[in-house]
Amino acid sequence: MSAFPDSMDQKFHNMTVNECFQSRSTVLQGQPFGGIPTVLVLNIILWVFVVLLYSFLRKAAWDYGRLALLIHNDSLTSLIYGEQSEKSSPSEVSLEAERRDRGFSSWFFNSLTMRDRDLINKCGDDARIYITFQYHLIIFVLILCIPSLGIILPVNYIGTVLDWNSHFGRTTIVNVSTESKFLWLHSLFAFLYFLINLAFMGHHCLGFVPKKSLHFTRTLMITYVPTEIQDPEIISKHFHEAYPGCVVTRVHFCYDVRNLIDLDDQRRHAMRGRLYYTAKAKKTGKVMIKTHPCSRLCFCKCWTCFKEVDAEQYYSELEEQLTDEFNAELNRVQLKRLDLIFVTFQDARTVRRIYDDYKYIHCGRHPKQSSVTTIVKNYHWRVAHAPHPKDIIWKHLSIRRFSWWTRFIAINTFLFFLFFFLTTPAIIINTIDIYNVTRPIEKLQSPIVTQFFPSVLLWAFTVTMPLLVYLSAFLEAHWTRSSQNLIIVHKCYIFLVFMVVILPSMGLTSLHVFLRWLFDIYYLEHATIRFQCVFLPDNGAFFINYVITAALLGTGMELMRLGSLCTYCTRLFLSKSEPERVHIRKNQATDFQFGREYAWMLNVFSVVMAYSITCPIIVPFGLLYLCMKHITDRYNMYYSYAPTKLNAQIHMAAVYQAIFAPLLGLFWMLFFSILRVGSLHSITLFSMSSLIISVVIAFSGVFLGKLRIAQRYEQPEEETETVFDVEPSSTTSTPTSLLYVATVLQEPELNLTPASSPARHTYGTINSQPEEGEEESGLRGFARELDSAQFQEGLEMEGQSH
């Protein structure tokens, strides 16, 4: 196909503009230099304001006394913006860092000068992998700035398609004539960017070895076991007969413990309240409280529901009631057995042999039989390596088969329609235009209206969407936390890329247009016009403004943590007593959400890579975002979040997504070549070939990486014991939390027996109050409970992965 002359390029460009965007649309109207200078200045001003505001709040909340801050300080700013001293004991915080952190803005400079070693010692090995990943992206984008600004940008600018008045448009690929040989540079660099990125991700993977602790255990998880089997000896007998020499050391049955876990949480909460008010009553006398959830919002004492009651008696009676309900449910749990068991064997080779025997059972292969085969029905079993006990979400094990898949499909179908069709910012603003809401401002033609507001709106949706995905993952009821986190990583990234990059880029700016594009066969005949929307200069400016907003306003708001503030305020206003508020404060020490942060960062990285060739000015702003994101994450990981231990598969998922990002740039170049120079042009053929080669290389690299890891684990394991695989006779010192039994079933009466409750003694008994030392000891144990649980869990899981 012959190339169009420059006049045809200009005519086609004008037709595309009129077709992609309505004349009154406030989304991507043409502005001087795309409105980028205005958006940049506004974001700098807002970033400075947010940082100064955060510095003030942080200084006002500064307190080195951890216990005083947690128990006695009711300051809202202290509870939200307090330092890591809220989450760790003073011995875990560097005294030198505290001494250097006394100035108004010293926290900012400390984040810049903080050594990686200090961050890793404080936050663990996952933090090291995360910041190393950021280092690779920063260096990669820094290298991309050289050809993007030094070669591609001048080539675009010297083009002759657009007028000299089109300042921003002249920096894009639209300004390059279809007859120009310089278009070869764009295709070559798009392929080169992919290869460089692949090399950087390969180098990053050398820095850590993904490990699955489940391959180092000698425990198998077996499903579809008949629930009528109550005797573990039947399971042991089957394995002894079917696999001679096999020694079963332990068999754990699983039960439906959803209600039991909820009751246990409630009675523990009541116990905390009783301990707190018993100790307080000894010092200050009887304490009266309001028990209605909205009592903090209403000061009226005339209503019955807002009457004050004796706090100690209220929590004592509540604890007694919940303990009775718990014990009754505990007796019923034995009748709620699930068709799932955990079987631990003596040696790892036996585990490998049994696992291989059941690996292909779904393909019609029959496993070995025994004299009890008709009872255990092992031909229906599904066998897998058992995850770490601390990784299992026990209350979700009862949701299986049809119910689980129905729930999963329904939730994700709803999210699909919500994010793809309804919440794209361009769709929302165009829908507003339909109802003439924007008519009063259509004559303003202000970059603040046409560029800054849509970019802020897009950023707001990219912040809200991962939160909804994160909450939906809990509704999906995954069996393990690792699978739940992996789902969050992949879903967030896929939804973000479609919502931010693909749909708006292709000009699908209204639900009506999308449905026509999807179903109207006559409308599809004009699909060429729609795909031209990818290469409009204003389209590139919109995404540059989005990257700028994410780099400045976005990172500033990550420091503020408004989500935590809103959550805290809601929970605080609905709390009924001081113990609940103490518990809420301690719960502010949440884990750093690596999956969510990976998705946010890689979404912006994908935007940069998609437009790095067609709109090269976006690359330095992408570098700005990565640097600002890195500094913000360093601060948040060190000061604001609790240490986190993850399955390394999450880090590998981020690597795969980063490898995918440059493919968007290759897709965009292929679309441009097909639409502008024809499907049989040599540049189009080269773009298609490079895209196919890149896809093959990417998938081959992912496949070979997974195969290499799988082969490593296929090798015979060393006879290394894990703490939950040892013989029963040697588990006297084994923590019960490391057994394949739900925690609530291990020692359900620990520290919560009805005999320890004052409610059991005060009615008709004398001298039944616990000793003061006992109460204070219980209160101290309550204060330590949340502090150590998360970090200890991370240490246990880390120990299993080595």
Curated annotation (Swiss-Prot):
Q: Which Gene Ontology MF annotations are present?
A: calcium-activated cation channel activity; osmolarity-sensing monoatomic cation channel activity
Q: Where is this region: Disordered?
A: 753-785
Transmembrane ranges, per UniProt, are 36-60, 125-157, 181-205, 402-431, 447-476, 481-517, 541-573, 594-612, 616-640, 648-676, 682-702
Cytoplasmic face of the membrane:
61-124, 206-401, 477-480, 574-593, 641-647, 703-802
Main location as per UniProt: endoplasmic reticulum
The yes or no answer to whether the keyword Transport is present is yes
| Known role | Acts as an osmosensitive cation channel preferentially activated upon hypotonic stress. In contrast to TMEM63B, does not show phospholipid scramblase activity. Enriched in mitochondria-ER contact sites where it may regulate the metabolite flux and organelles' morphologies in response to osmotic changes. In particular may regulate mitochondrial motility and function in motor neuron axons. Required for the functional integrity of the kidney glomerular filtration barrier.
By what name is this protein known? Answer: Osmosensitive cation channel TMEM63C
In its UniProt entry, the species of origin is given as: Mus musculus (Mouse)
Name of the gene encoding the protein in the UniProt record = Tmem63c
